[in-house]
Amino acid sequence: MEKDSIKVMARNREAYHEYFVEEEMEAGVELVGTEVKSIRQGTLNLKDAWCGIKDGQLILNQMHISPYDHGNRFNVDSRRPRRLLMHKREIMRLLGKVKQDGLTLIPLSVYFKGSRVKVKVGLCKGKKLHDKRQSAAEKDAKRQIERAMKERY
């Protein structure tokens, strides 16, 4: 496997529907036991996951990693909080934006970069109902334009 090859294991598609993604960052994940093997099998879910900053550390909460089939006693709690690895100054900058601007930290995807597990964290702002309707209308209009162009040629 190449050193920087990227293999996406899970995407949080709901996040793009619920939030405007202002900025994206990459962070490493501190995993224990058989969690990496379980992620390689693709048994993880980001649906309800969110990130928070506690005691100067970035924590990933509610990410579900199913127990590894052959892991027996090495398996850990599937929804335990996991520490994300970023530079201290990056975490402090995120803390300032979250506190001041009312933004949220949401995990957007989990992927392998080489042999390391990485998480793409998004600095997001929540969408209101009218924003969601507008996004749906724009997506629908774009589809109709593409359909018309396809029929033309």
Regions found by a protein language model. Give the residues of each.
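Ribosome large-subunit tunnel/peptidyl-transferase-proximal elements
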Residues: I6-L103
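Beta-rich strand-turn-strand
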Residues: L85-G122, G126-K128
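C-terminal end-helix/capping segment
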Residues: R79, M86-I91, K125-Y153
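Intrinsically disordered, low-complexity regulatory segments
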Residues: M1-S5, M9, A137
